[in-house]
């Protein structure tokens, strides 16, 4: 995760702003600079290589002292920064909006995946600039649209029906902020269209999840799509979701947290996110993740008869 201000800076032109991507040498200068505390939140002028991000975001970049940040010296950083600028320059951002826009915390890996989709000649985003920019505006939280299958970050499609598409995420192969844990495995489920979904299509998805992904929890980050994650990683997801939710509220970026379909979401996660939305502390919310829940009446009782036992998945074992 990183703020948009880690990728670009605003330049006032008439009554609107044009966004310009940072270059890696300017960032490198900023990372080595001694800056007064009162100037930590201001864009840094490297003198030689142009404007750099505010020093308060130093920890967002990979250095000798911090291996958890972005690999900003890779070509992928520039591609992501340029893509963000293209999207922001396609809309009007005024002086009253610019601080709010740049403070938004975004998924770096999501943006890298959109770059990969853009470069894939077989992908619809390669052929449609309008759809590409829509996808980016959704990814950076500037659009009220939800991420659907056409505008999704992408990955490897492992399941699809008339209503849903399930993707295996490819973060292990990333350049900008790769997942280093070689045991990482995670999926994302997007709706094909933002419209009511028939019960039969929900049934098909739940049957697939029960049999092929029975070692995983179905959760949501509140953005209109589902994530299918290992139970061992749920607490980590909870920390990130809670931090992003609080950060957005603090910065005035109030975005409705979409709880999604309770029949699909893991019961404990639904309780966690509901508690978070009510304003409870992280400690109180996380207790619900490990609490034994009263099993609710199953609207799809009998689904287990839809598959033979030899079809039960070994994924995640």
UniProtKB/Swiss-Prot annotation:
One of its GO terms (molecular function) is ATP binding. Its EC number is 3.6.4.-. It is an enzyme of class 3 (hydrolase). It is found in: Host cytoplasm. Signal peptide: none annotated. Homooctamer. Interacts with VP1; this interaction is weak. Interacts with NSP5; this interaction leads to up-regulation of NSP5 phosphorylation and formation of viral factories. Interacts with host DCP1A, DCP1B, DDX6, EDC4 and EIF2S1/eIF2-alpha; these interactions are probably part of the sequestration of some host SGs and PBs proteins in viral factories. Belongs to the rotavirus NSP2 family. Participates in replication and packaging of the viral genome. Plays a crucial role, together with NSP5, in the formation of virus factories (viroplasms), which are large inclusions in the host cytoplasm where replication intermediates are assembled and viral RNA replication takes place. Displays ssRNA binding, NTPase, RNA triphosphatase (RTPase) and ATP-independent helix-unwinding activities. The unwinding activity may prepare and organize plus-strand RNAs for packaging and replication by removing interfering secondary structures. This is Non-structural protein 2.
């Amino acid at each position: 995760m990183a703020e948009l201000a880690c990728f670009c800076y605003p330049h006032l032109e008439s009554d609107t702003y044009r966004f310009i991507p940072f270059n890696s040498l300017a960032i490198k200068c900023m990372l080595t600079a001694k800056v007064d505390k009162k100037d930590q939140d201001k864009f840094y002028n490297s003198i030689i290589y142009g404007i750099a991000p505010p020093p308060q975001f130093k920890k967002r970049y990979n250095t000798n002292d911090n291996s958890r940040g972005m690999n900003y010296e890779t070509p992928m950083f520039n591609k992501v920064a340029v893509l963000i600028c293209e999207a922001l320059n396609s809309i009007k951002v005024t002086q009253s909006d610019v601080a709010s826009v740049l403070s938004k915390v975004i998924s770096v890996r999501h943006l890298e995946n959109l770059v990969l989709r853009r470069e894939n000649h077989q992908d619809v985003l390669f052929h449609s600039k309008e759809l590409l920019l829509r996808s980016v505006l959704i990814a950076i939280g500037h659009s009220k649209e939800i991420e659907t299958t056409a505008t999704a970050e992408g990955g490897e499609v492992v399941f699809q029906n008339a209503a849903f598409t399930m993707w295996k995420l490819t973060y292990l192969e990333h350049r900008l902020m790769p997942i280093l844990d070689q045991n990482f495995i995670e999926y994302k489920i997007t709706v094909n269209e933002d419209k009511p979904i028939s019960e039969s299509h929900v049934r098909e998805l739940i049957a697939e999840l029960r049999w092929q992904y029975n070692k995983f929890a179905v959760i949501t980050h509140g953005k209109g799509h589902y994530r299918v994650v290992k139970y061992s990683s749920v607490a980590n997801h909870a920390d990130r979701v809670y931090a992003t939710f609080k950060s957005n509220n603090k910065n005035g970026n109030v975005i409705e947290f979409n709880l999604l379909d309770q029949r699909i979401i893991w019961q404990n996660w639904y309780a966690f996110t509901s508690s978070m939305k009510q304003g409870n502390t992280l400690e109180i919310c996380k207790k619900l993740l490990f609490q034994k829940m009263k099993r609710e009446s199953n609207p799809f009782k009998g689904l287990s008869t839809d598959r033979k036992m030899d079809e039960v998945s070994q994924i995640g074992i």
